[in-house]
From Swiss-Prot:
Statement: the UniProt record of this protein carries the keyword Manganese: no
Family: Belongs to the helicase family. AddB/RexB type 1 subfamily.
Native source organism of the sequence: Ruminiclostridium cellulolyticum (strain ATCC 35319 / DSM 5812 / JCM 6584 / H10) (Clostridium cellulolyticum)
Record InterPro entries: ADDB_N (IPR049035), DNA_helicase_suAddB (IPR014140), DNA_helicase_UvrD-like_C (IPR014017), P-loop_NTPase (IPR027417), PDDEXK-like_dom_sf (IPR011604), PDDEXK_AddAB-type (IPR038726)
Entry note: cofactor: Binds 1 [4Fe-4S] cluster.
Listed GO biological process terms: double-strand break repair via homologous recombination
Enzyme class: hydrolase
Quaternary organization: Heterodimer of AddA and AddB.
Record key words, sorted: 4Fe-4S, ATP-binding, DNA damage, DNA repair, DNA-binding, Exonuclease, Helicase, Hydrolase, Iron, Iron-sulfur, Metal-binding, Nuclease, Nucleotide-binding
Cofactor(s) this protein requires: Mg(2+); [4Fe-4S] cluster
Binding residue positions for ATP: G8, R9, A10, G11, S12, G13, K14, S15
Protein name from the UniProt record: ATP-dependent helicase/deoxyribonuclease subunit B
Its job: The heterodimer acts as both an ATP-dependent DNA helicase and an ATP-dependent, dual-direction single-stranded exonuclease. Recognizes the chi site generating a DNA molecule suitable for the initiation of homologous recombination. The AddB subunit has 5' -> 3' nuclease activity but not helicase activity.
Length: 1149
C-alpha cells in the first residue's frame, strides 16, 4: 500500500499524467481494478478524456467516479440504501416544521425563525456541519467551556436543538445526501471492495473532512492511491505564509501524509511535473508568463505587445456581451477555433445568462449555459402557488390575476382582460368573489344615470367568466377546509389541476414544443410537472399525519418548491460553454472569455458570515471543531480561484468589464486588471466607449447578419442626423438589399428612418365619421384642443380612455359635489326659498339629506357599493356644507339674485346652442352647462354674472383667455348675450364671470381667534376669482359690505369710490373679449374639421400640457426630435393682452 502525490502548477499536465498512468496499468495488468475519482461535475468529461487516451472506444476496466457515485456504488453492493432518499426540498420542509414547533423556545433565533430565507440559512449550516463530520453532541464539550450567559453559548444550544431534532426526524425514515459520504466511510471499513485496487484522485481544489475520511479508508485498502495537487512545491511552512496562493493545498498534503503515516502506509516518491515551460502553454509564451508571474510578488514583466491576452472595457453589460460574441466569431473565422474549444465564464452568471442567450442567438453562436433555472417563475408553479394565495390573501387582486395570467387556466385572455378592467374599476376582492349574487356595480360614476344597455351585456359576460373561475376554486376550498394533512392538500391540488384540464394542457405543450423542435422547452415543462408531483410526495412523506391549515401548508409547499431547479443537457458537442467561474473545467479549453471582471465581483467581496460568525468559528476551531473557512480565509481562497481561472486556457484569454450596470451606476475594473497591466505593460486593450471611426474598425462590427443589420440601422440613423459614416456601410447596405430575406427589412428600415413624429391630418371623411354630420362640442373640450390638438383627437375623436381604477379621482369628487349643490339649489328654487334666510344648521341638515339620497340612487356604482367610499362621501358632506353656506353668505352680501342653476345651452336646453359657421359653410354647435347665473335688474338693463363651481384651485388669467386655455366662462356669457340680442328680450349687460371654489380649507389662527375672525379668514381664502365689469356701483352691488378689499370678489374700492386694483374690464373690453373668443373658437373649429391634429403641446413656465396627459405613450412626443417641441406660452400683463386683442378685433372688423 502506498500514497503518492502528483503535483505541479496549473497546466503542468497532472490530469494527463493520471490518464496515461491508467493506460499503462491497464496494459500491464488487465485484471487490476482501476479507479479515477473526480469532482461530480467533471465525471462525464473525465470519461471522454479517458476513452480518448485509451483509444479503445470504452472504459470497462476502469471506473470513473465522484465521491457520491462511489457512495451509491458501495452502498448498493454491500447494503445501506434502506431508506428513501430525501430531497433538499424535503429537508427544508422538516426544518420549517422544527422552527414552527420550537420558535417560542428560542432567544437568539426567535425573530429570525419567521424571516424569509432563514430556513435555507439553517439548511446550509446543517449541510456544512455534516460535511465536516460535526454531530449535534459535538457541541457539548464546547458548551461546557462557555458561560451560560454567553451569547455564543445560547446560539450553540439553539443550533444543537435544531440539529438534533432534524436528525431525529430523519433517523430510520430517510437517507440524507449529506450523510452519504459518512456512511460510505463506515461501509468501506468493513469491506474490501477496493482492496488491491489502484486509485487516482484528480481535479480537486480542496477536500472536506467527509472526503478526507473516505480517502483515509481508501488509503488503507488500495494498493496505491495517487492524489493530484495543484501547487508549486509539495510541502512548505503553511503557518509562515497564509497569503501563499497554494497554502490550502499544502495543508491538505500534510493532512494526508499524517493519515498515511498513522496507518503505516508508505509515502511513495512524489511526481513533480513543474517545468519552465508547462505543456498547456506550449503554444503561448504570454499565457506561460501569466502563470509564472501572476501570483509572484517579484514578477517579471512581459515587455512585448500581447497577441493571446486582451483586455476590453465596455459601456455596459449588453455591449460587453456583444463584443464577446464578435470576438468569438473572429476567433473561429480567422484562427480556426471551434465553438467547443471556447468557454465564457463569469462570477455573476445570474446577471449575464439571459443576455448571453439572446445575443449569442443573434450571432448564430450555439451555446450551452451551465446553470439551473429556478422553477418558481414557471407558469405551472406560478399557477399553483397563486391559487393557494387566492385563499391565504382573501381573493386579492394580485393573487387572482397572477393565477389567471399563468396561461394554464383554459380561460380566454380577452375574457380575463375584460374581467380585470372591471375588477380594478370596482375594487372587487374577498367575499365579493364568492358571493352567489351576480355582480351589478356600474363602473360609470354619474349621479342619477341609469344603467346603459351595453353595460348590461358586459356584466352578463363578466359574471359568466367569474363563475367559470370561482366554481372549481370553491370546490377545491370545500375539499380542504379546516385542519388537514399534507396528503389531503396535495390530493386536493392534484384533483383541481385534473378537473380544470391543466395536466392535459401540459401534455399538449410538451407535444407542441417537441414537434416544433423546441426540445429545451419541452423538457422544461416535463421536468416541472414531475417536480410538482415529487414535491407532493415529499410533503406527504415529511409532514406525515400532522394537520394544519391551508396557510401553513402553502408556506411549507412554497419552501419545498423553492429548492428545485430545472437543468438541461447540451444539445450538441460543438457549442460554446457558458458557466460560472467556480465550475469551469481547465481541460481542453483553448479560449477563455471572462466577463464582468469588476471590483467586488471577481474577486468577490460579498462574503456573508452566515449563522456562525468568524469569531464563532475561531472559538470552535480552538476547541477542536473544524468548519468551513471564515471570510478572511475565503478571501485568500479567492486568490487561488483567480489563479486557476486565469491559467485555464491554452491559447487565448480575454478579460472584459463594463463601466456601468443595468441602472447606469458606475462600476470599476477589478484589481485583476491592474495586476495584468503590471505584468503586461503592452497588453492589448480595447474599448467600445468611443465609437469607431475608420472603416477598418467598423469591419469588426460585422460578425453575423442580425447584429450587422442592427449596426447598419445605427449607422444610417447617425447619417440621417448629419454624422458622416464610412463607405463600408454603403457596401453593407447593398449586400442586405440584394438578399431576398433582408430586402423587406431594408425597405422597412428606410421608411422608419424617414419617419417623423408628426401627426398627419386626418382624412375629412373620417372626421365626419368621428364627429358626425352636425358636430357639436363643449367649450372645455375645445380648450383641450388648444392645449394639445393630438390629445384632443385621441380622447374625444378616437374615444381612448384611461383604465378605470377603484378610487375617487378629483373629477369624480367634483362631479359628486356638483350634484349635491345642484340638488340643493333646485330644491331652493322649487320651494321659493330665499338664500338670505337660511341658517347654518338647516343647510347642514339639507346637505346631509341630499348626500344620503344620492348615495341611495348610486347604490350600483362604485361610490354606492363601497363602505370606504360611503365614509368618504360622509366626509364630503362637511365640504359641501361649507360651500353651500359660503354661497349663502355671498348672496346675503350681494344685491344679485340667482336666476338659474345648471342652465344648459344646447338642443333641449334652456338656451339654444351657439352656432359657429365656418368659412367652409360647415356649422359647429357649441353646448355647455352653466353652474349658476346671478342677475341684477337695473334701469339700463339686466346685469348678469356667471358663476362656475370648481373643486380645485382655479385662477383667472387674461393671458390664458388670449391663448385659448380659458374660454369657457366668456363663451357662456356670450351665449346669454347673443340669445338676448336675437330674441329682442331685455338688454343684457355683462356683470362678471367668476370661479367659486368648493373647499373647506385649513387656515392659520391663534388661540385668541374668535369664530367670526375664523369665518372671515375662510371667506378670504375662498374668495371668488374672475373678471368683473369695471363699475364701482356694480361692484358695491356684488359686495354690499366692501371696504377696501372685498373678501368675496376680486375687487378693491379706494377712498372716494375709486376702483382700486381689481380684476375688472370695461363694457367695451368685454365686447372685445367676446369677439376675440368667438373668432378663436371659429379658427379652432376650422382647424379641427380640416383634420389638423398636430402633436403640439404647450409649455408655460414649468407647466406643460403633457404634465397630466394620459396619452404620452400614444403620441411619443420626444424633444430630442427636431419636429417635436413645445409651444412656448408666456404670461403677459393685462394691458398688453388688451392691446393685442384690440388689434386683432380691428383687423377682423
Amino acid at each position: 500500500m502506498g500514497l503518492q502525490f502528483i503535483y505541479g502548477r496549473a497546466g503542468s499536465g497532472k490530469s494527463f499524467h493520471c490518464l496515461n498512468s491508467i493506460k499503462t496499468k491497464q496494459n500491464k495488468d488487465s485484471n487490476k481494478k482501476l479507479v479515477l475519482i473526480v469532482p461530480e461535475q467533471y465525471t462525464l468529461q473525465a470519461e471522454r478524456d479517458l476513452i480518448k487516451v485509451l483509444g479503445t472506444g470504452g472504459i470497462l476496466k476502469t471506473e470513473v467516479l465522484s465521491f457520491r457515485r462511489m457512495a451509491y456504488r458501495v452502498l448498493n453492493e454491500v447494503g445501506g440504501i434502506t431508506y428513501p432518499h430525501i430531497h433538499p426540498s424535503g429537508k427544508n420542509m422538516i426544518i420549517y416544521r422544527i422552527l414552527e414547533r420550537l420558535k417560542d423556545q428560542f432567544t437568539i433565533f426567535h425573530k429570525s425563525a419567521n424571516c424569509k430565507g432563514f430556513v435555507n440559512t439553517l439548511s446550509t449550516l446543517i449541510t456544512e456541519l455534516k460535511r465536516y463530520n460535526v454531530r449535534a453532541e459535538s457541541f457539548d464539550e464546547v458548551l461546557q467551556g462557555l458561560a451560560d450567559d454567553n451569547y455564543l453559548s445560547h446560539k450553540l444550544k439553539e443550533i444543537k436543538l435544531i440539529y438534533s431534532e432534524f436528525d431525529s426526524m430523519l433517523v430510520d425514515r430517510y437517507r440524507d445526501t449529506d450523510d452519504e459520504l459518512t456512511l460510505l466511510s463506515s461501509k468501506l471499513e468493513g469491506t474490501e471492495i477496493y482492496a488491491k485496487s489502484e486509485i487516482w484522485i484528480d481535479g480537486f481544489a480542496g477536500f472536506t473532512p467527509q472526503e478526507v475520511e473516505v480517502i483515509s479508508k481508501l488509503i488503507q485498502q488500495a494498493e496505491n492511491v495517487h492524489i493530484t495537487m495543484c501547487t508549486d512545491i509539495l510541502f512548505d511552512d503553511v503557518q509562515a505564509d497564509l497569503t501563499d496562493v497554494f497554502a490550502a493545498v499544502k495543508k491538505s498534503c500534510k493532512k494526508f501524509v499524517s493519515i498515511a503515516e498513522s496507518y503505516g502506509v508508505k509515502i511513495l516518491p512524489p511526481v513533480c511535473l513543474n517545468t519552465p515551460n508547462l505543456p498547456r502553454f506550449k503554444d503561448s509564451r504570454e499565457l506561460q508568463s501569466l502563470e509564472t508571474n501572476y501570483c509572484s510578488y517579484s514578477y517579471r514583466a512581459y515587455q512585448l505587445p500581447t497577441q493571446d491576452i486582451e483586455l476590453f472595457e465596455s459601456v455596459n453589460i449588453y455591449t460587453e456581451i456583444e463584443e464577446c460574441a464578435r470576438d468569438i466569431i473572429k476567433q473561429c473565422r480567422d484562427n480556426g477555433m471551434q465553438f467547443k474549444d471556447i468557454t465564457v465564464a463569469t462570477r455573476n452568471l445570474t446577471g449575464y445568462e439571459n443576455l448571453i442567450g439572446v445575443i449569442f442567438e443573434q450571432y448564430n453562436i450555439p451555446c450551452f449555459i451551465d446553470s439551473k433555472t429556478e422553477i418558481t417563475n414557471h407558469p405551472l408553479v406560478r399557477m399553483v402557488l397563486s391559487m393557494l394565495e387566492i385563499f391565504t390573501e382573501n381573493w386579492s387582486y394580485e393573487s387572482v390575476f397572477r393565477y389567471l395570467k399563468s396561461g394554464l387556466t383554459g380561460i380566454d385572455n380577452t375574457k380575463i382582460d375584460i374581467l380585470e378592467n372591471y375588477v380594478l374599476a370596482c375594487g372587487i376582492r374577498g367575499s365579493r368573489w364568492t358571493q352567489e349574487a351576480d355582480w351589478n356595480t356600474s363602473i360609470e360614476f354619474r349621479p342619477d344615470d341609469g344603467q346603459k344597455p351595453e353595460n348590461d351585456e358586459m356584466l352578463l359576460n363578466i359574471n359568466k367568466t367569474r363563475n367559470e373561475i370561482r366554481e372549481p376554486l370553491i370546490r377545491f376550498r370545500n375539499r380542504t377546509k379546516g385542519r388537514r394533512t399534507a396528503g389531503d392538500f396535495c390530493a386536493g391540488i392534484y384533483e383541481y389541476l385534473v378537473e380544470i384540464g391543466v395536466e392535459q394542457r401540459i401534455r399538449n405543450y410538451i407535444e407542441k414544443f417537441t414537434q416544433s423542435g423546441q426540445l429545451r422547452l419541452a423538457g422544461e415543462y416535463q421536468q416541472v410537472w414531475n417536480i410538482l408531483m415529487d414535491v407532493f410526495d415529499q410533503a406527504v412523506e415529511v409532514m406525515a399525519d400532522e394537520t394544519f391549515g391551508l396557510e401553513k401548508f402553502a408556506n411549507v409547499f412554497k419552501i419545498g418548491l423553492a429548492e428545485y431547479k430545472i437543468s438541461s443537457i447540451p444539445a450538441s458537442l460543438d457549442q460554446v460553454l457558458v458557466g460560472s467561474i467556480e465550475h469551469i473545467r481547465s481541460h481542453e479549453i483553448k479560449a477563455l472569455y471572462i466577463l464582468g471582471t469588476n471590483d467586488g465581483v471577481f474577486p468577490s467581496a460579498g462574503m456573508s458570515e452566515g449563522v456562525l460568525s468568524d469569531a464563532d468559528r475561531e472559538v470552535l476551531d480552538k476547541r477542536g471543531i473544524e468548519l468551513a473557512s471564515d471570510t478572511k480565509t475565503r478571501a485568500f481562497d479567492e486568490q487561488y480561484l483567480i489563479y486557476r481561472t486565469l491559467t485555464t486556457p491554452k491559447n487565448y484569454l480575454r478579460l472584459s468589464w463594463p463601466i456601468a450596470d443595468h441602472e447606469g451606476r458606475t462600476m470599476r475594473p477589478s484589481t485583476i486588471i491592474s495586476r495584468m497591466r503590471k505584468i503586461f505593460p503592452k497588453v492589448t486593450e480595447k474599448s467600445n466607449i468611443v465609437k469607431p471611426s475608420a472603416d477598418k474598425q467598423h469591419i469588426d462590427l460585422i460578425a453575423s447578419p442580425i447584429p450587422a443589420f442592427n449596426q447598419l440601422v445605427c449607422a444610417l440613423r447617425q447619417k440621417n442626423e448629419g454624422i458622416e459614416q464610412g463607405e463600408i456601410w454603403r457596401e453593407i447596405f447593398a449586400w442586405f438589399s440584394g438578399q431576398d430575406e433582408w430586402k423587406q427589412k431594408c425597405d422597412a428600415m428606410i421608411n422608419a428612418l424617414k419617419y417623423r413624429n408628426i401627426a398627419a391630418p386626418v382624412d375629412k371623411s373620417k372626421i365626419r365619421e368621428l364627429y358626425g354630420k352636425s358636430p357639436y362640442f363643449t367649450v372645455s373640450r375645445l380648450e383641450k384642443y388648444t392645449s394639445c390638438p393630438f390629445a384632443f383627437y385621441v380622447q374625444y375623436g378616437l374615444g381612448a380612455r384611461e383604465r378605470k381604477i377603484y378610487r375617487m379621482s378629483p373629477p369624480d369628487v367634483g362631479t359628486f359635489m356638483h350634484a349635491v349643490i345642484e340638488r340643493f339649489s333646485k330644491m331652493v328654487d322649487e320651494n321659493n326659498y330665499s338664500w338670505r334666510e337660511f341658517d347654518r344648521q338647516w343647510c347642514s341638515e339639507q346637505v346631509s339629506k341630499i348626500v344620503d339620497e344620492l348615495l341611495d340612487s348610486m347604490k350600483n356604482t362604485i361610490l354606492g357599493g363601497s363602505k370606504r367610499f360611503k365614509a368618504l362621501a360622509v366626509r364630503l358632506k362637511r365640504v359641501v356644507t361649507r360651500a353651500v353656506w359660503l354661497i349663502t353668505e355671498h348672496i346675503r352680501r350681494s344685491s344679485f339674485e340667482p336666476v338659474g342653476y345648471e342652465v344648459d345651452f344646447g338642443d333641449g336646453g334652456a338656451y339654444p346652442p351657439m352656432v359657429i359657421e365656418l368659412d367652409s359653410g360647415e356649422k359647429i354647435r357649441l353646448v355647455g352647462r352653466i353652474d349658476r347665473i346671478d342677475a341684477l335688474r337695473a334701469e339700463n338693463g339686466t346685469y348678469l354674472r356667471i358663476v362656475d363651481y370648481k373643486s380645485g384651485e382655479k385662477d383667472f388669467k387674461l393671458s390664458d383667455v388670449y391663448y385659448g386655455l380659458q374660454m369657457q366662462l366668456i363663451t357662456y356669457l356670450d351665449a346669454l348675450w347673443e340669445y338676448s340680442d336675437k330674441s329682442n328680450g331685455e338688454k343684457i349687460i355683462p356683470g362678471g364671470i367668476l370661479y367659486f371654489r368648493i373647499d373647506d380649507p385649513m387656515i392659520r389662527c391663534t388661540d385668541n381667534s374668535t369664530p367670526e375672525e375664523i369665518e372671515t379668514a375662510i371667506m378670504k381664502k375662498l374668495k371668488m376669482k374672475g373678471l368683473l365689469l369695471a363699475d364701482v356701483q356694480l361692484i358695491k352691488y356684488m359686495d354690499n359690505t366692501i371696504e377696501g378689499n372685498s373678501i368675496i370678489i376680486p375687487a378693491r374700492i379706494n377712498k372716494g369710490d375709486v376702483l382700486g386694483k381689481s380684476s375688472a374690464a370695461t363694457i367695451e373690453q368685454f365686447t372685445v373679449l367676446r369677439s376675440y373668443v368667438k373668432q378663436l373658437l371659429k379658427d379652432m373649429c376650422s382647424e379641427l374639421m380640416k383634420g389638423n391634429v398636430p402633436i403640439s403641446p404647450y409649455k408655460k413656465k414649468k407647466l406643460t400640457s403633457c404634465s397630466y396627459c394620459n396619452y404620452s405613450s400614444v403620441c411619443q412626443f420626444d424633444q430630442s426630435q427636431k419636429e417635436n417641441s413645445f409651444r412656448m406660452l408666456h404670461d403677459r400683463e393685462d394691458n398688453d393682452i388688451w392691446k393685442l386683442m384690440n388689434e386683432i378685433d380691428v383687423k377682423d372688423n
